Amino acid sequence: MRRITEKLHITKVYVEDAEKLIPKLGGDVQIVSAECWEAVAFAALLALRSFERGTNHARTLGGELLIRLAGTLQIKDAIAQNGIKNGENYLVVFGTRERALELLREFGLNELPLTGCDEEKVKTFFEKAALAEVL
């Protein structure tokens, strides 16, 4: 599990039944599909910042994370592109490490090693996440 800030934690997980977990997501918890943890972390930080500044487009941090990660303001498109899927995903908890560990147990998820991207790919993800700032 990677601590991004005191109140933001990300870990890679394997999801066997995405449909079962969807009703449990939202608010301060989201599971997203993405190529690397850096993209997820950057989008999550932008989501937090948008709520602090009152410039958020979504009603929840989880929704804002999705639109930032996808680089679109259309939540349906963001969910289709980066929403939870069966297989490898990232659990994002806008809360304490203890809360994140509690959710791992509650959801029955096992942590996987975090996967990083090469520098050029990370830059591309950062640019896409920042798009929501100017849309």
Please give the residue ranges for each predicted region.
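Short, flexible turn/loop "capping" segments at secondary-structure junctions
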Residues: 1-6, 83-86
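N-terminal interaction modules that seed assembly of large macromolecular complexes
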Residues: 3-59
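Ordered, amphipathic secondary-structure segments that act as subunit-interaction surfaces
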Residues: 37-95
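Generic structural hydrophobic/aromatic packing signal, biased to beta-strands
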Residues: 11-13, 31, 78, 91-93, ...
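Generic detector of well-ordered alpha-helical segments enriched in charged/polar residues
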Residues: 19, 23, 42-45, 76-79, ...
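Alpha-helix initiation/capping motif
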Residues: 17-18, 36, 60, 96, ...
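Glycine-rich, aromatic-bearing surface loops/beta-hairpins
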Residues: 82-135
